Regions:
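C-terminus-biased signal that marks the final domain/tail of proteins
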Residues: 6-10, 20-23, 47-183
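Structured, non-membrane catalytic/scaffold regions adjacent to prosthetic-group chemistry
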Residues: 1-44, 183
Length: 183
């Protein structure tokens, strides 16, 4: 492919790719100095669900044997091992936690925007408020972030264009992150 032949220089990008039948979210990160190419993962968003991204890699673990719903660079895991960034099992490999670990800034200034959109249209998002405030907890054998939001949520109702516009325009009004409340 083009990235393998010509390279890719970026700390990372997230893409929403869609047609009338399906939507995919793809994350792509250049291999860095002295390397050519990129590592990437793409996941199909399940029917009836929504996803979002805002300047922070969000794909964590992913199925390795489901080409109908997941595609990834052949060396996405082996490259991390070669660099000494990951020693765990293939099953536990988390793209975001290995290549772009979420920190306070990633959670508070990027993921919080996704949380705000999800919070407007899906019940149960209050359990991720602490994470949206920038509190990232770590656990497990690889010490990955353990309180992250899901990559996608099922909205409480079918969304209208106006609903989506409201999500895009949200500034945390009416939440604990409301900037008019001096937080």
């Amino acid at each position: 492919g083009l990235v393998e032949d010509y390279g890719y220089y970026s700390s990372g990008e997230s893409f929403s790719i869609s047609d009338p039948e399906e939507v995919w979210i793809m994350e792509l990160i250049g291999k860095g100095e002295g390397e050519k190419g990129a590592v990437w993962v793409a996941l199909k968003v399940p029917d009836g669900y929504i996803s979002g991204h805002a300047n922070q890699a969000r794909i964590t673990t992913f199925p390795k044997n489901d080409p109908e719903n997941c595609m990834f660079a052949e060396d996405v895991i082996s490259f991390a091992r070669e660099k000494g960034w990951y020693e765990g099992t293939d099953e536990d490999f988390s793209f975001s936690d290995v290549y772009v670990p979420v920190d306070f800034g990633g959670a508070r200034f990027c993921e919080a925007r996704v949380w705000a959109g999800f919070n407007k249209v899906a019940s149960g998002m209050e359990k991720y408020t602490e994470y949206a405030r920038g509190v990232v907890k770590h656990a497990g054998p690889n010490n990955f972030a353990s309180n992250r939001m899901p990559l996608w949520v099922k909205p409480d109702k079918k969304l209208s264009v106006q609903d989506v516009m409201g999500m895009m325009r949200d500034h945390f009004e009416g939440t604990v992150l409301d900037m008019t409340q001096d937080i």
